[in-house]
Each structure stands twice: as C-alpha cells, then as structure tokens.
Amino acid sequence: MPEQAVASASPHHPQAHGAGLAKLALGAIGVVYGDIGTSPLYAVKECVTLPHGVAPLAVNIYGVLSLIFWPITLVVSVKYLIFVMRADNDGEGGVLALMALVARPSAAAVTADESGAHRASTRTTWTGLRKTKMLLIVLGLFGAALLYGDGVITPAISVLSAVEGLEVATSAFSPFVVPITCVILVLLFAMQKRGTGGIGAVFGPVTVTWFVFIAAAGLPWIVRHPEILRAMNPIYGARFFILHRGHGFLVLGSVVLCVTGGEALYADMGHFGTRAIRLAWYTCVFPALLINYFGQGALLLERPEAAANPFYGLVSGAWLYPMVILATLATVVASQALISGAYSLTRQAVQLGYLPRVTIVHTSGQTEGQIYVPEVNWLLMVACVALVLGFRESSALADAYGIAVTGTMAITSMLFFFVARDLWKWGALRAGALLAVFLCFRSEEQTSELQSQ
C-alpha cells in the first residue's frame, strides 16, 4: 500500500510580512479561530451548571477559571503554537502530516530548525515498515477519521446552536429551527468555492468584531473585581480537585469546551502559515478570550444567579440584542475552521495514497495551501444536514463533539513525541516529559467525557 511523502519544514508563506502578513492574520482570525472563539458562549456556563457542573460559589469560580486558563495556555499557546506547528509536511499541518513524518524511512533530512525547501517525495510499502511505524500509521489514520468527524459535527452543532437562539425570543420559531439550520448550512458550503482567502476576507472582519465585543463585555467586570485575576494561580485548580474529588474530575468534560477548535490551528496551517496564525492568536484571540472568561468569573462573584447564562449576563439593555446577532454570526463562522481543515487533510491523504484522486482547486495565486475540494465539500454538506435532521438539537451532539476533539488532540500528542524523538533527535526524557504534560491532561478530559455519557 502506498504510504509516504517526505516532509519539509518550509512554510508556504515565507514571503509574508508587513501588509501581507496582516492580511493573512485577518484571514486566519476568520477561518482558523472561529471555533475556539465562540467557546465563551457555553464553556463557563456548562462548568457552573448542574448536574455535571458545580455551584457558582467563589471557591468554585476561582477553581473553574484556573482550569480554563491553564488548558488554553498549555494546549494552544504552548503545545500547538510553540511545539507542534514546528513539524510540517511540505508546509501542511494536521494529524496526517505528523503521521507522514514518523513513518519516514530516514530521519536525516528533517530537524526542528530546518528552513530549506526540501520537496522530494518517496513512497514505501507496509512490508518495509517496522511494526511500530505501522501502528503509528494506523493511529494517524484513526486521528484523521476523528478530524473528519469533527469537520462534520462542528458545522452542524455550531449553526444549530446559533439558530436555537431564536427560540429565546419566541417559541413561535421552534418549528423553523431545523429548516433554517439546513438552509444556512447549504449556503455555507456553497460559499466554499470562493476559497479560504475569499471567505477569510468576509469572515475575518466579523470575527475580529466578535473578539472586540467579547473583550469589551468582560473588561468592566474585571475592573470591578480585579481579584478574579488570582485564578491564574494553578493552586486554585488543585484546590478545586481536593474539594470536589470525583465530581471535579467530571467538570473537565465541560472545561474541554474552551479548547475546541485547537486542532484546527494545526490542520489549517497550510492555508495561512505559522506566522499569521501565531500573530492572530497572541495579538487578538488569546487576550480577548481571557478577558471574557475572567469577566464572566467576576460577574459570577457579584451575581451568582447569572450562572444560567453568564456570557449574556455580561451585557444588558440595548447591547443584548446586538450581541445575540453577532454571536449567531460568529457561530456560523466557527464552522469554517474544520471545513478548511478537511480540505487540507484530504489533499494529504491523496498525496500519501490513502484516498483516491479528487479534484483539488487552488483558490489563490499567492498561497499554495489555500485549496477547495468539491467532492469533500458536498459530502460534508450532506453529512451535516443529515446530522441536523437526525439529532435536531445541538445538545444531542455535544458529547460526540467533545470525544472527537479530545481524541484527535491526544493522537496528535502521541505522534508528536515520535517526531521529536526520532526526527528532531530529542532525548527520550525530554520528549517524554512534554508528552506526559500534554497527554495526561488530554487523557483526563477524554475519560471525563466518556463518564459523562
């Protein structure tokens, strides 16, 4: 069975700087960060809502915020942006890129600091692979399957949850929730032929506006209760587990919602490049998310009764309805990250010989990684619409969503260990220590998700 393409560490965007880099960063905000950017809508709410959550007491609020702060920091800022995104397969990221790296017959050409444009490709057979590499290939393919599943579930649950917000205004909308969701999904997938660059140009400003609004909503509450920033101390997370024991472990099943979309950073690397994705995260997305999460915590310190919906509790009066409209747009945008990731995943699978040839349309003359795959696009659309028609409620999809996310991230961590040890020549202790930090946390969240079924 054909399997292999030799990897390269050269990005697709080496020339991006100045205005070009800013444009790519804007597109990355719209395409890559839509999913993780809408997590404040429900992450804190699920953590302080019974039966799986905890009561909105001060000690619990500090603990929950600590559990949210450190996963975002360790998983996104450290794991993906500092370490994992340094490993690419000819500029592409994602679980198949890692699989291709670890399955190479020779490790001579790839190091962590390599910047040359090594474009050679080779293929190998199953008989030429060691058993360990065969197992890693199977693991990588399973991770790819989970990412495809995530690409189907994310648009369905995001758009469905947004349209369900219409029921808050009046129950008269209830019969129209599913039909409206299906129409929006069809329109979303019909837009894909514009390419991620064109879509990013449309979605980018919407998502930037979203991040500005959620930061502006949270900041006044932090100013009123600056003591909430103490939750950055990990001791509060430790105390939370000591206090709640087994139930605190279950809360991790809700905490994982704050990093949904994290794998999209890596899967979409070929569309925008590492520099643009990192710039967008550190200058816009990361600060806005933290301000909003800590703002929700400060709100709950003063008004525990707001636990029913702490996100919308941050705003009131004339600002409530604009926020509802913007949130609806943002959740629709959130679908894009995994759709784009599915295109990149498909191209890699075709190049490695695991999928038959498909039509791959390059939608940008400047950015090689920006592609559109019609066959995958329409298959995803049919699958998403089928999920909506079958489940009809976003809550029915939530558990499968969390399992797909944590499973993919855990597999990425394991494959990264072998890249670091075998290709980058890190010591087993160094690579193993990093794996322990990443995989231990992901395994706890995976188990808590399964126990909450």
Predicted segments — roles?
Residues M1-S448:
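The structured alpha-helical core of multi-pass membrane proteins
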Residues E449-Q453:
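Short "domain-exit" segments at the C-terminal end of structured domains
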